[in-house]
């Protein structure tokens, strides 16, 4: 992969410290993912916050002395590990890339039973119920024919109270999608399985979920149906596909045996409970689906909704009189009664769980992580870029020798810019650069998504581009994030001083945790990852109803992991920590320029 060889000015981090006789101005310059300086300003705190920035100091403080210093920012590629994947979009398909290997996706989902949903009653000489509404429209025994199976209130054929309560024709599943990744005409196939274990709403479902824990791998017991498809269905006329109202789908018909058994249980239980038939009761009968890609490489569908229709046979009736309508044309051997198929829908919604299972090529991902002359972002659940900020050095320069000064210096306006390599590719279906990325303290990278939080500029900061031609991820002010780190360090130092030690919880990539006890701040810094941040590709949802038509802005209402295939190659990498004989950083393939700024003195 090409690397640039020109001299690049990545930015700088400016800090100004005020004291009675002079002010020290420190300029901190990072490697590639450099803290670009808008301004970091320190000043003596006198309960007057009007003096933010050099230009806002009183006249007597305008003349200052300054000196220059530099500090490195370290970046490296790290495994994304398992990520939180409970979203309202299901991903299914397979795609192989020459750099990142094969990525495969499938999803597990519950289906929602609408509150108060009921099935029609059986026609009993009239379709009208006690309230004179035509709700008894399911065919009676005479209308069952060969295309519907009767459902009775008891399986005991000798029971004198046995009666027909409904029928089942089939069950169909529609997987609706508005977009996809990859080749529109790659031949693919998916299979749908019935879950035999409930998805627990109390657990956070991650991309490493094991589907086999929730369904019977014996296909005779769990397979509901299969379907071959292409992302663009050429059997649909162009004129139809071009309609704004057209939404493509993969249509899966349940196997006859599965449809009859599941449909019978659903309708029977719904008949018993009436309007009290709810999600809890529905889940006892049908726990959900697992949608798995089992053939084809080159396409990933983004499923907006899975919709299961329980289909039954009905009479066409006069809604006023309740009388069956007759066919206008009756073929020999056919019933004269006019019939049609009705259905009740159970679909994926925000009220139920949908969990994506994503599988990346571990060897290919590891090879990319081992690359040390740049870093990667790779979605979904592939690679994050970890950033280590020089906060310990910032703290040392911020804190003076006296306790009074330790409490009086503050930080203001730090800008971080992370340059992106401009990629050129002749791949027909190349992955795009992630547009929205979240910079977050490493300690919060899991809980942020579990709790469905929004960026607060204290523990996290969101980058949203204002143009499609952006060349770096820019975070205009991470000051509060640095202050949050410093607050953690101060708290740890205080606890060590008062108690003699502090216990740190360390979690590995697999989610395994262990406790470590340290008795000095240096060991705490080394183990706590207090100064580490992670750059994560995200999917941002905005509230269109709150859009400001004049400024074109809208409120962010949700930030989730981006589960669409995408990647970016970022300038940086672990080689930036290597120094030459003079102690200067060495940057492979990119020349590094120390920034020099003039020093001003008070007269």
Predicted regions and their residues:
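C-terminal globular interaction/adhesion domains in large, modular proteins
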Residues: 153, 193, 198-386
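Conserved small/polar residues in nucleotide/adenosyl-binding loops
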Residues: 593-599
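C-terminal motif of bacterial Sec signal peptides marking the signal peptidase cleavage site
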Residues: 43-44
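A short beta-strand-loop element at or near the start of a globular domain
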Residues: 49-180, 247, 268-277, 354-422
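Extended, compositionally biased non-globular segments
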Residues: 377-551
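Positively charged n-region of N-terminal signal peptides that target proteins for export
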Residues: 28-31
């Amino acid at each position: 992969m090409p690397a640039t060889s020109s001299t690049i000015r990545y930015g700088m981090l400016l800090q100004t410290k005020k004291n009675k006789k002079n002010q020290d101005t420190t300029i901190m310059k990072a490697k590639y993912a450099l803290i670009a300086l808008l301004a970091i300003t320190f000043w003596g705190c006198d309960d007057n916050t009007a003096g933010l920035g050099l230009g806002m100091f009183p006249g007597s403080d305008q003349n200052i002395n300054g000196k220059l210093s530099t500090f490195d920012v370290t970046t490296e590629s790290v495994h994304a590990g398992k990520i939180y994947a409970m979203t309202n979009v299901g991903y299914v398909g397979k795609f192989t890339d020459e750099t990142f290997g094969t990525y495969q996706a499938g999803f597990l989902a519950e289906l929602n039973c609408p509150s108060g949903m009921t099935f029609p009653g059986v026609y009993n000489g009239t379709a009208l119920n006690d309230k004179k509404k035509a709700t008894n429209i399911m065919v009676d025994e005479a209308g069952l024919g060969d295309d519907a199976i009767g459902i009775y209130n008891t399986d005991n054929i000798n029971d004198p109270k046995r009666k027909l309560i409904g029928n089942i024709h089939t069950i169909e599943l529609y997987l609706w999608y508005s977009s996809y990744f990859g080749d529109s005409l790659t031949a693919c196939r998916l299979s749908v399985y019935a879950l035999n274990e409930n998805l627990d709403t109390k657990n956070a479902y991650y991309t490493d979920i094991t589907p086999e824990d929730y369904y019977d791998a014996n296909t005779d017991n769990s397979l509901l149906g299969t379907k071959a498809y292409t992302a663009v269905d050429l059997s649909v006329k162009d004129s139809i596909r071009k309609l704004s109202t057209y939404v493509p789908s993969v249509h899966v018909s349940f196997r006859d045996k599965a449809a009859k058994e599941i449909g019978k249980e659903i309708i029977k239980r719904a008949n018993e409970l009436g309007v009290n038939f709810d999600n809890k009761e529905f889940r006892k009968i049908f726990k959900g689906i697992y949608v798995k890609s089992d053939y084809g490489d080159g396409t990933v569908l983004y499923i907006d909704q899975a919709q299961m229709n329980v289909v039954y046979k009905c009479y066409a009736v006069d809604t006023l009189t309740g009388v069956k309508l007759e066919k206008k044309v009756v073929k020999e051997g056919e019933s004269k009664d006019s019939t049609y198929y009705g259905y009740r829908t159970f679909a994926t919604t925000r009220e139920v769980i949908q969990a994506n299972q994503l599988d990346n090529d571990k060897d290919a991902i590891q090879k990319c992580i081992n690359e040390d002359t740049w870093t990667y972002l790779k979605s979904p659940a592939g690679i994050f870029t970890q950033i280590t900020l020089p906060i310990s050095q910032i703290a040392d320069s911020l804190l003076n020798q006296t306790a009074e000064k330790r409490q009086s210096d503050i930080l203001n306006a730090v800008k971080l810019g992370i340059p992106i390599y401009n990629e050129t590719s002749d791949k027909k279906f190349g992955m795009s650069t992630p547009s929205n990325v979240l910079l977050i303290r490493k300690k919060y990278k899991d809980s942020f998504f579990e709790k469905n939080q929004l960026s607060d500029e204290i523990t996290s900061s969101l980058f949203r581009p204002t143009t499609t031609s952006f060349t770096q991820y820019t975070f205009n002010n991470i000051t509060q994030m640095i202050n949050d780190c410093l607050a953690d360090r101060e708290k740890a130092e205080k606890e060590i001083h008062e108690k003699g030690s502090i216990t740190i919880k360390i979690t590995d990539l697999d989610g395994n945790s262990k406790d470590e006890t340290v008795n000095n701040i240096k060991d705490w810094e080394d183990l706590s990852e207090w100064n580490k941040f992670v750059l994560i590709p995200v999917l941002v949802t905005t509230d269109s109803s709150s859009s400001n038509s004049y400024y074109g802005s809208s409120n962010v209402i949700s930030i989730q992991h981006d589960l669409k295939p995408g990647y970016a190659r970022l300038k940086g990498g672990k080689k930036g920590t290597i120094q030459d004989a003079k102690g200067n950083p060495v940057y492979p393939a990119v020349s590094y320029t120390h920034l020099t700024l003039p020093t001003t003195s008070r007269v």
